[in-house]
Structures are given as C-alpha cells and as structure tokens.
Curated annotation (Swiss-Prot):
CC cofactor note: PSI electron transfer chain: 5 chlorophyll a, 1 chlorophyll a', 2 phylloquinones and 3 4Fe-4S clusters. PSI core antenna: 90 chlorophyll a, 22 carotenoids, 3 phospholipids and 1 galactolipid. P700 is a chlorophyll a/chlorophyll a' dimer, A0 is one or more chlorophyll a, A1 is one or both phylloquinones and FX is a shared 4Fe-4S iron-sulfur center.
Subcellular location, principal: membrane
Annotated binding of phylloquinone, by residue: W709
Organism whose genome encodes this protein: Synechococcus sp. (strain CC9605)
Similarity annotation: Belongs to the PsaA/PsaB family.
Superkingdom, taxonomy of origin: Bacteria
Subunit structure: The PsaA/B heterodimer binds the P700 chlorophyll special pair and subsequent electron acceptors. PSI consists of a core antenna complex that captures photons, and an electron transfer chain that converts photonic excitation into a charge separation. The cyanobacterial PSI reaction center is composed of one copy each of PsaA,B,C,D,E,F,I,J,K,L,M and X, and forms trimeric complexes.
The protein's enzyme class: oxidoreductase
Gene name in the database record: psaA
Name used for this protein in its record: Photosystem I P700 chlorophyll a apoprotein A1
Length: 767
C-alpha cells in the first residue's frame, strides 16, 4: 500500500455546483438545436439522418468536458427510469395476466405464461395449453423461476412490485433533471476516481450484496424451504400449522419474528450475539457450503447463495477502504499507474503507464471501452453459468428458458465487446494526444501494431484453414463413403484432452478446496445426473472429436472479430495508406476525391465489419450450445434411470461434417417452425419468414453503391416535377456510411429474429 503523509490527502470541498438551468420542453420543438447546421432545418433528406447520427454525440455539441459529463450523468438517470418502467411492466404482467400461482403449485407440469392474446380476428390460436386449465403464450425469460427464488408467493406481491418500480422510475427521472438543471456535479467530482472506487466497491457492491444477503436469509431462504417441502410432498409445520400451499406461507414481514425463523433454521435462535462473540458456526444451517444442486428444484441451494453474498459483501466492503481520499492513507490510482514501468526485456516501455491515468480520466470513451470489454466478457461468462450452475428453482428443466437465457447473454456480450472496439477507436481519434504518451505502454503498442496485427492475421489464417480443413476432409470422406477415414470418435479420434483435463481438475479440486461440501462445483464437470420431475436438470457433459472441431471454429471466428476490432483501434489515427486519418475523424467514407482505394477504411467501418463477424461467431456458439444440450444433456429419465435425450446423442456423429450441421441440426430442427401454421407457435412461423425478409432487405443496402440510388432518385424526382408534386426537401441517396449502417442494422435484426423464431418454435414443442 502507498502510505503518504497526511497533507497528501485532499480536503473535502463541495463538488456540486448550484446551477439555474431551467428544465423546459421548448427545445423538444426545435429538432437539431444541438448543432448550428442542423438547427437551420432540413434542406435535403440527409438532414434527418444526420439528426439521428449526432443527437447523442455529446462531443460534437460541445468541447466542454464538464458539460459532456453532466449530460451523460443525467442520461444515466433517464436510462434507469426506463429500466424501472420496463421492470414494472414485467411485474404487472406477472400480477395481472399470468398463471404464476398455478405454476408455483405445480412447476414441473405447468408452463409459465404471462400473456394472453385477445380474440380479435382469430389470434387466440396462439394461446397454448399451459396446464392447469390456463391458456396463454409461454414465456422463456426465467422470470417465474427468479420470482420464486426471491420468495414471491402471490400475484398481489407482484402488483406491489409493479407499483414500487414505477415510483422508482419517477425518482430516477427527478434525479436526472435535478442533477443537470439544479445541482450539477463539477468535473472534479467525475474525475475523483478514488472516491468513486470506494463508494462503488463498498457501497454498490459491498452493501448491495450485504442487503441482498439479508433478503435471501430472511425472506428467500425460509420461503423456498417451505415451497421445496410442499413440492417434495413433505410439507413443514410452522407454529402448529401445516404449510400445504403457497397461500399458507407467512408474509415476508412476519419473518421478522425470530422464533418463527428459528423453527426453520435453528441458527436464528443464536441471535446477533453469536456474530459478535465469533461463534459463527451457529449460523451454519442458513449460511451453508453444500455445493451441487437442490434435488427438489434442480437449482443451487438458497443457503449457499446467501453465504456467497455475505462473502462477496465482506470482500467488497474491505476493497472499498483501499483508496486514498481526504485522509493521507491508501492507494493512489495515479501513483499505481506511474509505478508500473514495464519489463525492460519483454516490454521495453521506458515510461511504463505514465499518462494513462490522465487519458482514462479525461477520455470517457477510453473508460467506456474498458468497461464495455469487461461487461461484455462478464455477460458471456453469465451465459455459461446459467446452465452449469442454475441459480433459480426449476430453471434447469425449463429448456426453452435455458436456450433463451444462454442466447440472450451471449449476444449482449458480443454487442458490448464490439462497442468496446468502437469507443476505443473514438478515444484514439478524439482524445489521444501523442505528446502525452511518449514511450509509454500505449505508445509502444501503437509502434508494434504492424507486428501485432500481422501475427494476429497469421493466427486467423492458421485457425481458419485447419479447423475448416477438418470439416472439408470429413465431408469429402463421408461423401465418398469412407467413414473409417474420418475424424470422429469411432475412426481417427481427436480428443479435446485439455478441456477434459479442466473438467477433471474442477471435479477433483472441490474435495480439497471445499472439504465440507456435499457435492462438486457443477454436475457438468464429471458429476451425476440430477433429474427433476422426470426431466434432466443437469448431467456430466462428455466432450469428444465433434466438440474439438467446433471449438476450433469458435477460436477462428473470435480471433477474426478481435483482428478487425483491434486493427480499427490501432490504425484509427493513421496508417501507411492514410497518414492523416485522425484529421478525418471516426467515420468518413473515403479520403477525398483523387485518392482511389481509400474508401471504407475509417474506424467506423472496422466496427461495421466487426459486427458481422461478431454475429457470425456467436451464431455458431448458440447453435453449438443448443444442439449439444439437446443431444447429450437434456431429455427424460426412464424408469430404469437411463436418459432418452431429445436428439438421441446425434451430436458426436453429425456435428463433424458441414452437411451434418445443415441436415441434422438446421434442417431437422426447422421442422417445427416451418410446420407451425395453425398451431400455437404460428407466430414464430410468421416471424421466421418476416425476419428472413428483413435480412434479405439488408442486402439491398449492403450490395449496391450510392451512385445507383442517386441516379434512381433523380429519375423519380423528374417524374414528380412533371406532375408538379416536387418535394420541398430535396431527396438525396444515403451516404455510404448511412447505407452501411441501415444495412448492418437490418442484417442483425433479421438474423437475430430468425434465430429467435427457429429456437422457440422447436424447443417449445420438443422441450
């Protein structure tokens, strides 16, 4: 720790400025008010596109970093308000239009639904039989499972949450207005990183986890224990009364009664005395370390989850006391940065991390890039944990929800990581001052960019040629009727020995790292089959040649995505082709007339290309997950204990050829969506076709040039002039960048909605 004399701590002073900036709606009536050229109003149709492109580009409105910071801060409150309204809608649907109580009573047979279609012109065909006499649309968001884990036992509680979320939305909107128009933080407040770290670590994460642990201990754990006992057919008795249904469970405030809780968890009778006397073992019945899954619900033990949040809280509250603020003790981020000098042999940046502190505290794009990269990676990690360590009751046997949650978190992660590339490039163009980064680590990376990119390119070629080559070989051998010459588990076997070793290590490590645990970290790692209601909740995942092959396709596509994004960042300011790129900005179509071959080279264009490869990459990831789970994990458990998998284990033999992926996965599993008309999944059939159309529409923007459209427009304008109906606003073809933006947006929207319909129609029927 860097300890310094007391005078090094800065004195506390007001970091908020009283401003008189009246909140008015007048500006809403002046489109383009933020830009002098746009404020004059539209002369051509390009105006509306520039309006959309620049409305949120605060850097373009003003160069005052304090003003930009205040706008972003205020917008965050607006964003939170929208989130609370969205949450309120989810709670309201659960309270008003759902079969939540019916699902709670029989979660293994009743399907979750929170929407019923009104019969206006025959749409009621979409209302499927959810069980227990309820007709509706099946939801796959995991909300019911999450609500049960929270301890919600009735629709009345959901309605209270819906109202509470609206109140919170109102508070957030008010805070957003107040902190921009009345009392706005000064720039130094936004740049006070030590205070921010202390508050975010100890406050948001530490006390946030502690308060959630309190909820889990005092509400979730007792409620889920009572619910689990009902579901297991062995209801518990509280105060002499048998708790036979959700309606019998005490309301959350009744659990303030320590004696009531002690009947479920005797550790509560120890009170807080055990905490202060160090007798923490007294709490071991509600702060557990069991490991594995609850056999009744197929989810993590609620008492393990409580223990986890207590531990996280302790860690982060400690972490929130590490940084130097008004007292001269603790870490200084600037000193930590400037203390990093690099390795003279491996990384000879003589000035180490000098200049990075100022870059990260003056460039919000640089800060955002780091946060998006981390946030995106965390989202992808969450996707993996949702099936390997399912946290919510009955989530693991709701296969449509499991595919939905995996796909959702994978795609969110992909978009955030591409966003990281975008904002890193913007930071390089707008905020990077070469004079402040002489021979530091960032400067050295930029100097080595040719070596980095050419090596990464070589890796991509190697991975692509070899991984695709394995498939080409297998397709050729299968086409020629030579299965004995294929790469497969039964012929030329290529086992993923490293992945299998990791599985074994995880399975074995739990015994030494958590000796009192009852089970391992995850059943996926060489565990055992956990069945709930006759369905597989979790099971060991066998890995073989097919997994080895598709994993190297993943490696290839992910490396190409990284190559595109990293090249965009490292060459954002200059390149051999365009040495003065920084002067042209983040997005430009070409380097002016007379410079052939300089189009589509801006940092923006790298983000554009990166989005396609991100989509490519993650489509294969979600297809792999969906097929692997249906083939080797998910299914029904027979009376003799054997498992009948949904696709009968066909992954190992079919996923080793391209034809197998097309025939036994895409085509075989598209049966339900193609044949959905007239059934309750018909909407997915229409969506499947509609999304294909949106995808095809995108190609019109991606495969034709601007000149083509300008010629067409001029011909159409001529016809309008002939009829004397010429528009006052002159029509213009989209610019190259506008056209590519419209194209990629529809490409991704069409692709994602097609996949959504394909997954849902199939798994809702077979899952």
């Amino acid at each position: 720790m860097t300890i310094s004399p007391p005078e090094r701590g800065s004195d506390a002073k007001s970091q908020v400025e009283k401003v008189d900036n009246p909140a008015t709606f007048e500006l809403f009536g002046k489109p383009g008010h933020f830009d002098r050229a746009l404020a004059k109003g539209p002369k051509t149709t390009t105006w509306v596109w520039n309006l959309h492109a620049n409305a949120h580009d605060f850097d373009a409105h003003t160069s005052d970093l304090q003003e930009v910071s205040r706008r972003i801060f205020s917008a965050h409150f607006g964003h939170l308000a929208v989130i609370f309204i969205w949450l309120s809608g989810a709670f309201f649907h659960g309270a008003r239009f759902s079969n939540y109580s019916g699902w709670l009573a029989d979660p293994t047979h009743v399907k979750p639904s929170a929407q019923q279609v009104w019969a206006v012109f025959g749409q009621e065909v979409l209302n499927g039989d959810m069980g227990a006499g309820f007709q509706g649309i099946q939801i796959t968001s995991g909300l019911f499972q999450m609500w049960r884990a929270w301890g919600i036992t009735s629709e009345t509680q959901l309605m209270a949450l819906a109202i509470g979320a609206l109140v919170m939305a109102g508070l957030m909107l008010n805070a957003g207005v107040f902190h921009y128009h009345k009392a706005a933080p000064k720039l130094e407040w936004f740049q006070n990183v030590e205070s921010m770290l202390n508050h975010h670590l100890a406050g948001l994460l530490g006390l946030g986890s502690l308060s959630w642990a309190g909820h889990v201990i005092h509400v979730s754990a007792p409620v889920t224990k009572l619910m689990d006992a009902i579901d297991a057919g062995q209801p518990l008795v509280l105060n002499g009364k048998t708790i036979a249904s959700a309606a019998d469970i005490p309301l959350p405030h009744e659990f303030f009664n320590q004696d009531l809780l002690a009947q479920l968890y005797p550790g509560f009778s120890a009170g807080v005395g055990a905490f202060f006397s160090g007798n923490w073992a007294a709490y071991s019945d509600f702060l557990t370390f069991k490991g594995g899954l609850n056999p009744v619900t197929g989810s993590l033990w609620m008492t393990d989850i409580a223990h986890h949040h207590v531990a996280i809280a302790v860690m982060f509250i400690v972490a929130g006391h590490m940084y130097r603020t008004n007292w001269g003790i603790g870490h200084s981020i600037k000193e930590i940065h400037e203390g990093q000098k690099g390795d003279p042999l491996l990384f000879p940046a003589t000035n180490g991390h000098d200049g990075l502190y100022d870059f990260m505290t003056n460039s919000w794009h640089a800060q955002l890039a780091v946060n998006l990269a981390i946030g995106g990676s965390v989202s992808i990690i969450v996707a993996q944990h949702m099936y390997a360590m399912p946290p919510y009751p009955y989530q693991a046997i709701d296969y449509p929800t499991q595919i939905g949650l995996f796909t959702h978190h994978i795609w969110i992660g992909g978009f955030l990581i591409v966003g990281a590339g975008a904002h890193a490039a913007i930071a390089m163009v707008r905020d990077y001052d070469p004079a402040k980064h002489i021979d530091n680590v960032l400067d050295r990376v930029l100097k080595a960019r040719d070596a980095i990119i050419s090596h990464l390119n070589w890796v991509c070629i190697w991975l692509g040629a070899h991984s695709f080559g394995l498939y080409i070989h297998n397709d050729t051998m299968r086409a020629l009727g030579r299965p004995q010459d294929m790469f497969s588990d039964s012929a030329i076997s290529i086992q993923p020995i490293f992945a299998q070793w990791i599985q074994n290590v995880h399975a074995a490590a739990a015994g030494s790292t958590a000796p009192n645990a009852l089970a391992g970290v995850s059943e996926v790692f060489n565990g055992s089959v956990v069945a709930v209601g006759g369905k597989v909740a979790a099971a060991p995942m066998p890995l073989g040649t097919a997994d080895f092959m598709v994993h190297h396709i993943h490696a290839f596509t992910i490396h190409v995505t990284v190559l595109i994004l990293l090249k965009g960042v490292l060459y954002a300011r200059s390149s051999r082709l365009i040495p003065d790129k920084a002067n042209l900005g983040f997005r430009f179509s070409c380097d002016g007339p007379g410079r052939g071959g300089t189009c589509q080279v801006s940092a923006w264009d790298h983000v554009f290309l990166g989005l396609f490869w991100m989509y490519n990459s993650l489509s294969i990831v979600i297809f792999h997950f969906s097929w692997k789970m249906q083939s080797d994990i998910w299914g029904t458990v027979n009376a003799d204990g054997s498992v009948a998998h949904i696709t009968n284990g066909n992954f190992a033999q079919s996923a080793i050829t391209i034809n197998g992926w097309l025939r036994d996965y895409l085509w075989a599993q598209a049966v339900q969506v193609i044949n959905s008309y007239g059934s309750n999944t018909a909407a997915y059939g229409i969506m499947f076709l509609g999304a294909h159309f949106v995808f095809a529409f995108s190609l019109m923007f991606l495969f034709s040039g601007r000149g083509y459209w300008q010629e067409l427009i001029e011909s159409i304008v001529w016809a309008h002039n002939k009829l004397k109906v010429a528009p006052a606003i002159q029509p213009r073809a989209l610019s190259i960048i506008q056209g590519r933006a419209v194209g990629v947006a529809h490409y991704l929207l069409g692709g994602i909605a097609t996949t959504w319909a394909f997954f849902h129609a199939h798994i809702l029927v077979v899952g």
